[in-house]
Curated annotation (Swiss-Prot):
PROSITE patterns: ISPD (PS01295). One of its GO terms (molecular function) is D-ribitol-5-phosphate cytidylyltransferase activity. It comes from Bacillus spizizenii (strain ATCC 23059 / NRRL B-14472 / W23) (Bacillus subtilis subsp. spizizenii). Its EC number is 2.7.7.40. This is Ribitol-5-phosphate cytidylyltransferase.
Amino acid sequence: MIYAEILAGGKGSRMGNVNMPKQFLPLNKRPIIIHTVEKFLLNDRFDKILIVSPKEWINHTKDILKKFIGQDDRLVVVEGGSDRNESIMSGIRYIEKEFGIQDNDVIITHDSVRPFLTHRIIDENIDAVLQYGAVDTVISAIDTIIASEDQEFISDIPVRDNMYQGQTPQSFRISKLVELYNKLSDEQKAVLTDACKICSLAGEKVKLVRGEVFNIKVTTPYDLKVANAILQERISQ
């Protein structure tokens, strides 16, 4: 089976003085997360679409889904975990409980606050994860990347041609991700907050899928202004 998992577990601390997590803030009068969910609903390859939400916001998540989308049997709201990877695993535990996990089952995970992903990005993630087992969505680095080990002085300037900026979706063969995650110590789980890094450090090849510059993550007030500008431009076309 092919699952989508929309990660809406963040609290939005970088958004400033707002009274709700950033995924629920309005983007052209509709919550950001609704724009994201709709992109996945448009793809009929998904058997289930999981939305992972903070416990205290589960009812709100269900309410806005009902208001803006209506009934869809593919949609399921699941309680998130203490961090990103634990939220991914919360969704996987739900899948295991309800459907069991087959060796060829895959999951396409995506930030709820990246509302501008495209049908191409989703389809290429599905195709690539079915073939390779682990996938990351990236764009080429435009600016020079500076590395500093002490946050005071330059330690290294990597060759920009080899540098990429990570986006989402990140996609995985479920059985392999579970196997690798369960091998981690508590200390490793606290440090390895990116699921693709878990795969890479274990020697698994992670296939790259080309993202888009406009596939932005809305985490700050400035990002929200940019997102509104992108949306208004599309509406006016």
